[in-house]
Amino acid sequence: GVGAAADALLWGDANPSGRLPETWPLRLEDTPCYLDFPGDGRHVEYREGVYVGYRWYDARKMPVLWPFGHGLSYTGFVYRNAQLTADEFAEGDSVRVRVSVKNVGMMPGKEVVQLYVADCTGTTGRPPKELRKFVKVKLEPGEEKQVEFTLTAQDLSYYDETLGSWYAAPGEYKILLGHSSRDIHATLSVRFSAPRRRPFVIDENTTIGELSKDDRT
């Protein structure tokens, strides 16, 4: 039961390997919904948009108590030899991401390797990074294993309301590998090419930065 499991963890007979599915803030006032909850009567507005959870805290560069994906262990893990099978790929193709993970402690343990993607194309309204893949790997003391992920255009995409479909802008993306959203051990760069480009509309709200980043202006 729960008591036996807690006893095994406290005495070191078992090694924890769970990860937090949410961010623990330092203060309730730091949460994105603080000013909107409990709302007016039965009406509550959710204004976060895509900036939910760790995306909100990352975008505002806010310190947190425990980050998304964080977890405890009686052992330690080292990441090394992170690499891509290609520096560039196109829509319809894929690229593999590989990294070696080693248990450098004295106990068997399980590490959850998390892969985040950061859009560096200049697309507005995207979080600093987004979790796209993860895998749990079991390692004996001193054991090392290679972890592999396959990335496609879908892993770089966001839903574009103007296009009415999922879309990945051509350009550079960062691939971040780590223990949690705030504990990144390796960063790689990959370029994505696609024949379809999002329509660039210039109006009174267009910024100088947006104009300078687009080669069509």
Q: In which residue ranges do the predicted regions lie?
A:
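Intrinsic-disorder/low-complexity, polar/charged segments enriched in Ser/Thr/Lys/Arg/Asp/Glu/Gln
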Residues: 94-96, 144-148, 185
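Terminal connector regions
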Residues: 153-198
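Short acidic, flexible loop segments centered on an aromatic residue
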Residues: 106-123, 129-131
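Intrinsically disordered, low-complexity Pro/Gly/Ser/Thr-rich segments with frequent PxxP/GP/PP motifs
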Residues: 123-161
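Non-catalytic terminal accessory/regulatory regions of metabolic enzymes
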Residues: 211-217
